[in-house]
Amino acid sequence: TSETCSLDIIGAKFIREIENGEIVVITNKGIKSIKPFPVVNCRPDIFEYIYFSRPDSELGGKSIYDCRKNFGIELAKESKTQADIVTAVPDSGMPAAIGFAAQSKIPFELGLIRNHYVGRTFIEPVQKIRSLGVKLKLNANKSSIKDKKIILIDDSLVRGTTCHKIVKM
């Protein structure tokens, strides 16, 4: 699993990651590892580090939170942009924004508030539904952003729907 946090929640001990092409069978008789496929040169899916995995998980022996925070630190080192605040597209953009703010010495503020009862919008099949989903999912925290020059950190750009709606807020 790429979600080691699920093991934490149930009190299970993380032993190791399942290898590429491996099948692990768990029965009453024990655990058996099968590798029926030829070994290939696999590469990690970067979206696991920047978007899909929860920040309280580990992947490849690395903390997802620390990876995302370090992405923000590196981005701040490259950026010469000045602003009043740093904010993030919640939730997965938060660690990178925190890292960016720490490195740049620009204060972090919650500029967008997320409705946690709306799911991922980029997977919706129709643009109109995706746009409505973004509108329901995010709202500007006006007291934090009004009349401010903002650095907005997002973790990924899949379709651009979220970006366009946020700018209009």
Language-model regions, residue ranges each:
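PRPP-associated nucleotide enzymes
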Residues: 1-169
